[in-house]
């Protein structure tokens, strides 16, 4: 699988899912931490729980704000601050974590529309309209230094496998 590009991570038994909304305009803000409530006794927050039950994440049962220790919340904020300094995320995204005891692990960053979890912001006073308006305004004001150099896939096409590209 590694040669084909799959990333595998170990299963973290008896962990909880924690979700946080991130916005970068007009300044960096984080929503409250959400803890989704699983619809069954499953160990995992399943695809069915996340996207099919009750109309998806927005209609799912949750603790919002999550009843978590302040130290755990501070760890999440520290990870988010580091993440934003590294990835140059713009606009709105949802960041998913797993927690077990006093440890928190970054699981994924959801930057695609449909994964924004805009409902996370209503709890702290931002409507979906406010968020969309801020995203549009951010694109008008910010210039980026993105380039399409290397986007033709030449480097990957000439590599014998992904591992050789990663070093």
Regions found by a protein language model. Name each.
Residues 1-59, 67, 99, 104:
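Phosphate-binding site of ATP-dependent enzymes
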Residues 67-167:
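ATP-dependent carboxylate activation and anion-phosphoryl transfer catalytic cores
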